[in-house]
Amino acid sequence: MLRGKTVRLSVAIFIGASFLGSFRSAALGGRLDGAALHSLSSLEEMARGKIKITPHVALAEGLSAAEVPNADPLGGERVPNYIRALAQHTKAAPQFAHLVRTVLYGGSLSPETKMAIVLRVAQVYGSAYTAAHAQRWLRASESGRGLLAALKGGAEESLPSADSLALRYAELLTRDIHGVSDSDFQRVRAHYNDSQIVELTMTVCFANYFVRLNEALNLPVEAWAFEPTANVQPAGLRESPSARVALISDEEMEATRAALAASRSPQPGGLGLGIANSQRAMLRVPALAQAWREYGMSVRNGAAISRELQLHISFAVSMANGCRYCTLHQVLGLKRLGVDPKKLLAMRKDDSALTKSELAAVSFARKLTRMATVTDEDFALLKAEFGERGAVEVALQTCAFAFMNRFTDGLRLPSEDEAIRAYQEIYGAGAVARDWNW
């Protein structure tokens, strides 16, 4: 259920409780607030030096494009290393390929604007792999090449105001999930409607996911990522409507229908909320909502790590980011799994109640949350605890909440009554207002 009648998109949330402030400060020490953007020239130099690096995990070297449709969002026979990594360790490679393509070419916003958003997030974190792919995507159209030239040439002020605002929005939301102020948001709203704002936000969230996936797995940059790219317009996703407004497609109607059906058939280990408010917001862009949901379900189904461990990871990430909405959801999920309330009480303060395996997972997750990268030693320790497949799943769960924290608290989505009730049953009457100033 919605709490209140109006959902205000993307306003700053101020965390008033001292416990959360200290927890978040410790978890995110050394983060990138205020750091200069990495230049595109430096990222390209870094990327060329990463062609022959050793990844943290095995890649499906023999995988062909025929086995994973649209492995390359631009089409053709290329299979990126992020698809090879997922194919080796999960069954979710086809769904992720579809997600990438849908984020870039689905919805109503310009693909080039969304590609530039991915590039900007790569600049924030210094992700050479992500930047190489984002620039390749931009080179696949005339307008993309023009946008890329402006960014490389330091002529960002020459961009249309809507594009400049989108890039600023991406940077603010990437640096801090509460980084978009009311005034920042009102400037965005002057150029974009609610559905477009949701699409912008999902693109920023996806880029934060994508950077962490690529960096956690230490993926080598493919040599072909630097090759000239022919003009590309993938068929089947974006066809210019003759009407003055875009018509909802059969696929988008199916996405909405599928979400309604799923709410009536609760998933094992789910939260029991029906359609959560996060889903209600995402369904303003049904194609992206469906692609994200299908990918998430494909990762979760048949996972090697337990559902409880997944929730411990997402709790740690959400607490580190100061995300009210997602923290309440993780408490609800852990409570529904039967986790001892005493453990939940302790987890709000420190890690003393965690098992050795849980501590290994959440420690890794916090590092990946903070800087969007980890060391070889960090990943080796994770593999020693969970094996290679389990380590990949820990990374994917962390990435998922880099996405969800920014989407939910970034858009200031209201917590559902059921989530509030569960939280306050553990932490006391008025705990949501006390802990989250909400």
PLM feature spans:
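Conserved alpha-helical segments that form or flank metal/cofactor-binding pockets of metalloenzymes
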Residues: K114-L148, V317-K342
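Acidic/histidine-rich alpha-helical segments that form the ligand environment
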Residues: S158-M202, K349, S357-L396
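Bacterial N-terminal signal peptides
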Residues: S10-S22
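Alpha-helical scaffold segments that form or flank carboxylate-/histidine-based iron centers
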Residues: R78-A85, S110-Y125, G154, H191, ...
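Preference for long, well-ordered alpha-helical segments
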Residues: D184-R187, D194-P234, E388-D435
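Secretory/endomembrane lumenal or extracellular ectodomains immediately following the signal peptide
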Residues: L2, A27-T113, R139, E222-L309, ...
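Short alpha-helical scaffolding segments that buttress acidic/His motifs in well-ordered protein cores
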Residues: L86, F96, V100, A116-A122, ...
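Bacterial N-terminal signal peptides that target proteins for export
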Residues: M1-V11
